[in-house]
Structure formats: C-alpha cells, structure tokens
Amino acid sequence: MPPLSLLIKPASSGCNLKCTYCFYHSLSDNRNVKSYGIMRDEVLESMVKRVLNEANGHCSFAFQGGEPTLAGLEFFEKLMELQRKHNYKNLKIYNSLQTNGTLIDESWAKFLSENKFLVGLSMDGPKEIHNLNRKDCCGLDTFSKVERAAELFKKYKVEFNILCVVTSNTARHVNKVYKYFKEKDFKFLQFINCLDPLYEEKGKYNYSLKPKDYTKFLKNLFDFWYEDFLNGNRVSIRYFDGLLETILLGKSSSCGMNGTCTCQFVVESDGSVYPCDFYVLDKWRLGNIQDMTMKELFETNKNHEFIKLSFKVHEECKKCKWFRLCKGGCRRCRDSKEDSALELNYYCQSYKEFFEYAFPRLINVANNIK
C-alpha cells in the first residue's frame, strides 16, 4: 500500500476533562460500548506490525482521544520500542499527539521532545474563555495546567501547535483569543468549529456556534492574521493555510476542505477501525486491525459506502462561484438527519460572506508566498 496514516484512540473515549462541547463524548454515548478502556499491548503490537509491514515510504501514527495520555507514558515508550522492532523496511515514521495538556509533566515533555512527536495542545484562549467550557471531571478549571504544559513544551523544545474550539463565546471575543495567543508567541494555530451532537437540532446549546457568529469570527480573525502578515509576522492558521493551498495547488492537505471524504483509519482501543473521527459509531465499524489487512479494511462495503455518500454535490453548490474554493466543506457540517442525503453546509452563508470579504487579500498573500 502507499504511505499510511492512522488516527488512534489508546484510551478510547476516556478523559479526565468534561468539556461541555465534546463531540466524542456524544458519539460514544450512542455506541453499544461507550469505552473500550486502555489499548492492550497485543492490540498495540498488532497495529504497529500491520502498518509497518503494509505501508510504503512512510507512515503516520496520530494519537487522540478521549485523552490519549491516560494510556500512560509507559504505553508510548512501548510504542517506540515496537516501532523500532518492526520497522524492517526502514520507513519514515511520524508520531503525533493531541492532548488537553493537564497531565503533561517534565517526563512527558522530555519524552515527546526526544522522540520528535508533533503535539497538538487543546487551548481555547485566555483564562476566562478557556475555563468556560473546559472543566475537569470535578468541575474545576484547567487553564493553569494547560498553560503549564505549553511552558514545558517550550522548555523541552517540543514541536507543538494550538487547537482552539470556536464556540459562540469564542466568536464574540476573537480579539482576546488572538491577542493572547500572540502574546504567548504561539505561531501555529488551528481553530475548529464547535460541533453540536450528531443529528441533534443545531444551535440550541449555549456553546453552539451559529452561522452569523461564525461569519463575524472568520472576518475578524482574518483581519488580525492579515495585518500580521503585512507586518512580517506570519502566523500559521490551518484554515487560512488550507485556503491558500487550494488557491495555489487546487486542493488542501486539510481533511474537510476538499469536499469529499477519505478513509482516516480511526483505530479504537480494542482495534476496531472506522473511516472518520466524527463517525466512530457501530454503524460504520469496518472491522478490526488485528485480523484484517489495511487493504481489506479499505475495501469493505461500509468504507466505500461512507466515501461515496460524500460525493454528491448539492444543487446550490453547483452554481456557486465559491465552490472551487469551498468544495462544499466537511461532510459533518452537511449531515443533519440520519440515513438522509447530505444537505447544504450549515455554515454555507458564513463561507460565502467571508470569501466576498477576504478573497482579494487571500490572493495577495498567495502571490507573495509562491
């Protein structure tokens, strides 16, 4: 097979936080088994051996959750041992970790640095904004622990970026959020839409990100980002980077920006494999990585069905002048009713207004970075 990328949940849906907007919590509540616990050593070895045997060129192991650090540092030390043991083809291996940061200490930071992990740190901005939705299981604030994790990453020279969930409150205070990240010298930022639970009415929660709020957020964030670009202080914002890739190359490296789905090979802690992080549901279970090859998993009828469903272009999109840039957006924002055709993207109007507002300046940036 070509290079392989896996998204792995070593602690299943387990987490030491109780974020109000957690999409994976709502997903796992709708499975026969809410949590599969910590990944066993035999599952880990089967997975590593499988990928290193079948991939060509390089492969990527991305650990997410739940909270992956709940698996323990020993789990990841075992991972490195197994990668060395089974990498007889001398593949280039990329490891990454998405964490809430609350369990990061000196030992973790040192390990991540020494083993060249790329780390995503979940942080929603300054204290009052972050703590609003990101409490621990006891209802306590988490900001100070996350800020401490960022300091440790800098101390040990861990390569990391910030993942910020955009809620209604974030959208209203984008100036505070961007200013805080800038003060902390965070140069790599990813802002992701807060998702209401799958197949529930959209916009009914206090945290829900409504289209009008998202429009304002995108415009204001772009203004700050563009001003910094003109002043020689370029900040990487994944969504804007994805748009620039689309302008310059015709497609983006970011999932959700190309209009159609691919198979992400999401691996739950019991070895079960799913096509997408947003659809880790019994309905879309492809099989188990312990007893099926990656090719067999990819060729399952369920995977083909999942991908095929994303190919239908909405009639409104076909006549939209921004379709080549937007491509309909992420399937998750088009999926409103179970077992129904995908609809127009929930944020369609937001994107239209944003593109009208920012496109000339996006072209200017693209021309300057060719």
Curated annotation (Swiss-Prot):
Record carries keyword Oxidoreductase: yes
Matches recorded under InterPro entries: 4Fe4S-binding_SPASM_dom, Aldolase_TIM, Anaerobic_Cys-type_sulfatase-m, rSAM, SPASM_anSME, Sulphatase_maturase_rSAM
Top-level taxon of origin: Bacteria
CDD domains membership: Radical_SAM, SPASM_anSME
Binding site for [4Fe-4S] cluster 2: C255, C261, C276, C330
Protein biosynthesis keyword on record: no
One of the Pfam families matching this protein, by short name: Fer4_12
Catalytic activity: L-cysteinyl-[sulfatase] + S-adenosyl-L-methionine + H2O = 3-oxo-L-alanyl-[sulfatase] + hydrogen sulfide + 5'-deoxyadenosine + L-methionine + 2 H(+)
Pathway, per record: Protein modification; sulfatase oxidation
Binding site for [4Fe-4S] cluster 1: C15, C19, C22
Cofactor note: Binds 3 [4Fe-4S] clusters. The first cluster is coordinated with 3 cysteines and an exchangeable S-adenosyl-L-methionine. The two auxiliary clusters may create a conduit for electrons to travel from the buried substrate to the protein surface.
Active-site annotation: D277
PROSITE patterns (alphabetical): RADICAL_SAM
Residues reported to bind [4Fe-4S] cluster 3: C317, C320, C326, C348
Residues given in the record as S-adenosyl-L-methionine binding sites: Y21, G66, S122, R134, L195
Other remarks in the entry: Recognizes the CXAXR sulfatase signature, in contrast to the oxygen-dependent formylglycine-generating enzyme system (FGE) that recognizes the CXPXR motif.
Quaternary organization: Monomer.
Function: Involved in 'Cys-type' sulfatase maturation under anaerobic conditions. Catalyzes the post-translational modification of cysteine ('Cys-51' in the arylsulfatase CPF_0221) into 3-oxoalanine (also known as C(alpha)-formylglycine (FGly)), by a free radical chemical mechanism initiated via the reductive cleavage of S-adenosyl-L-methionine (SAM). Is also able to oxidize a serine residue in a synthetic substrate to FGly in vitro, and in a serine variant of a Cys-type sulfatase in vivo, but this activity is not physiological.
Name of this protein: Cysteine-type anaerobic sulfatase-maturating enzyme
